[in-house]
Amino acid sequence: MDYPAQRDFVKELAVTCRKAGLGLFIYYSVGIDWHHPYFLPNTMYDPARPHYKEVPESYRFRNVEDFKHYLNYAKTQIMELCTQYGPIAGIWFDTVGGVYQYSELFNIQEIYDMIHQIQPHALVVFKTGANGNEDFITGEREMGSLAPVFKSVGLPKKVQDAADFSWESNNEKPAELNIPIQALGWAYHTSSRQRQKS
C-alpha cells in the first residue's frame, strides 16, 4: 500500500457488505481527476482541473496523446476493483461532461466491456448515460437529459447532443434518482446553514 492510511478501505467495505448481505457498488470518478498528472487540462474541459493561478508542476499533460497515461491508470484501477474484492454489484461512474466532449479519448465502452467480462453480473451506470449502453440510469435531483445543464454553462453542442443521445437510449431502463440530504449539495460543508454532515 502506497498511501498514508496503510489500510485497504475498499477491502474493509467489501467484507462489511458481504457480512451484511449487501452487494458492493463502487463509485468511480473517471470523468474528472484533479490529481493525476496526465488528466485533461481545464483549457480542454473547464471542470477538469481547479483554476490555479499557476499550473502545478505535477500536471504533465501537454498534448492529447498524453491522456493515454491517465486512461491506462484508470483502467488498471477499475480492473483491480473488479478482481481484488470478490463479486461486486456494480460500478457507478461520474462525471460525464468530459466523456461526452472527448468520447474518442475515454472510449468508455471498452471500460464497460472489461467490467462485464470480469464481473458479468455487475451493473454499470454513468448518470443518465455516457453512450447509451448502461445497465440503468441515475438522475441527479431530476431525471432527463443533461443537455440543458451543459448548454447553460456553455459546453459545446457535441456535449449537449451526446447527453440527449444517451438519455434517449437509456430513458426506458430502470432508474435511480440521487438527491443530497444537504441544502448546500454534495459532500461535507462547514456552513452553519448545514445541519446534516453526510
Where do the protein language model's features map onto the residues?
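Mature catalytic domains of secreted/periplasmic carbohydrate-active enzymes
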Residues: M1-S198
